[in-house]
């Protein structure tokens, strides 16, 4: 027990590193925020062949929308190929084939591909589309644009991204900024959008302009096919195949470009259970990428020590969640130790202001009413802490296993504030993590009570925030599990499924 205060202090300092990281990225962003990357001149006759890949798995609500969107891209039809990489086991396949046939009749080269076996999940599908599809279905493009099933790219997407490759022979990947079709659907979606805007507006721009390693976000981007091949291709040993490949490409000497002025609209999940599933997948995959790439990063002769340190902080960012759980669990025993005076959280101090500053800057950059949008921050903070337990389990899986099950995030064709999800067979329900979250909320309340009784008043706010956070996430999960079916909502979506976005 004598080591417990030391361990607690070290964990608090470790958490402070992630807060400091936000300040570093904000500083880099502010230095470079006025730098603009203009789109090179476009000579339509010189545009190269492009293959669009859209991996799909049981997405009957949105599959027709994404096919319509990519078929409407402004690009020479004789140099545009669309692969719908369909691993679905439900009605999605029929809908996709019918919509693809509709566009083929209008001269668009769009094909729905079914591989013999669903191996490697998304990474396996992308690799199969590039390397194993044969005949007319084989990928023909020199450049590969990727969109998940819930994306709805704007018609000029390729014209604003592909020309950059023609002027930079070592450019391997272009990532664009995500925007959101259903940002204002609910408080949960507004909170997620605030977090994602912070990543895309400040973090990605800071990493790119600061000469740091940056990530591909899995969709809304374009790759040079030669870069994919020379960097080892898509690999399924991590659940973040996008993060893995983008780091391997940069370690191999390829350059990446981030274009904040080009946006790719997509959907964010309305369910807290879906958000937790998504975050768990990213947590597990990021830790697997850390295990896989930490050695090559440290040995790289291309990177300075500052770049290496920032890369490791980036890959390890989800370790913050088990650290948060450990801080909470250690606090109560510390309070009960004889002759122990107080628990200090001074290591978090000002650095805890890093994330909210980052979010505020992102909203100020994007929206005139940024102050109103920052009202989502309290809920985001509660959710960010409240998912710590489910992400802790995911981090543990990432530390002891390679690969894993790619549990998709269900999407429901929600646009603006319209649409519904309660009648869908894809809706998720609360799981065993909810029970643990309730237990952790009660544990945090007990810690606050003991802190009051022992005179450690500085621990009380910390404990109450944890109690509120775990209680919020558990409560949202239970409320959405018990939400009644609305009736007719899915029929309305299906009838309108062919509408262009």
Regions found by a protein language model. Give the residues of each.
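A conserved acidic beta->alpha catalytic loop
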Residues: 76, 86-96, 116-119
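N-proximal low-complexity "stem/linker" segments adjacent to membrane-targeting elements
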Residues: 1-68
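Cell-envelope/extracellular polymer assembly enzymes that use nucleotide-activated donors
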Residues: 48-53, 81-83, 229, 244
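The conserved acidic donor/metal-binding loop of glycosyltransferases
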Residues: 88, 148-152, 237, 249
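Long helical/loop segments within the catalytic core of UDP-sugar-dependent glycosyltransferases
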Residues: 100-143, 155-239, 251, 272-316
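Short, acidic, metal-binding catalytic loop of nucleotide-sugar glycosyltransferases
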Residues: 68-79
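Donor nucleotide-sugar recognition loop
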Residues: 229-247, 256, 263-264
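Membrane-embedded multi-pass helical conduit in multi-pass membrane proteins
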Residues: 13, 29-31, 42-44, 314-405, ...
